[in-house]
């Protein structure tokens, strides 16, 4: 299977051959779901914490006698049903990360890239750059590609491109080595230079 290629075309019409392993794999929904879920879970901070009745300061003395007051009996002013009391099921810091091995991660990335190709959401260009860090210039280029909400993948960091895209809420620029499954599926289109595609092919092929 490693010898097979997928034939794609750039916007200008040039033919590009890419590895079928990286850009032509059959979609595995369960695998992609597991990897994306694990990726999102790994981004959770997990530092929330609350105090139980045992941890809230005070409340050691019985607030009033057991009988004769007409009130419901109480043993502590830090009971969860009292204002200022502890939390019944106090939250604890938690590590939400999930283990995903390298083979699964690579497989999910291959599935996502192949699905982008099948859905015509992957836009290949010879190169993608702007002469100056101007948002207006970048927006015009994206509109020409019908890609207003796009992830731009380049083979190297382009300072002008990064600065031009910084003010656009639905546009992001990443290096080919920094793509992740969530970013690939979050945008309507993925605008990718041929050089970036070749770099990804080496990484995933």
From Swiss-Prot:
GO terms classed as biological process: translation
Pfam families for this protein: Ribosomal_L4
Recorded superkingdom: Bacteria
InterPro entries membership: Ribosomal_uL4 (IPR002136), Ribosomal_uL4-like (IPR013005), Ribosomal_uL4_dom_sf (IPR023574)
GO CC terms of this entry: ribonucleoprotein complex; ribosome
Molecular function GO labels: rRNA binding; structural constituent of ribosome
Keywords: Ribonucleoprotein, Ribosomal protein, RNA-binding, rRNA-binding
Region (Disordered): 47-70
Quaternary structure, from the entry: Part of the 50S ribosomal subunit.
Biological role stated in the UniProt entry: One of the primary rRNA binding proteins, this protein initially binds near the 5'-end of the 23S rRNA. It is important during the early stages of 50S assembly. It makes multiple contacts with different domains of the 23S rRNA in the assembled 50S subunit and ribosome.
Family: Belongs to the universal ribosomal protein uL4 family.
PANTHER family from the UniProt entry: 50S RIBOSOMAL PROTEIN L4 (PTHR10746), LARGE RIBOSOMAL SUBUNIT PROTEIN UL4M (PTHR10746:SF6)
Protein name: Large ribosomal subunit protein uL4
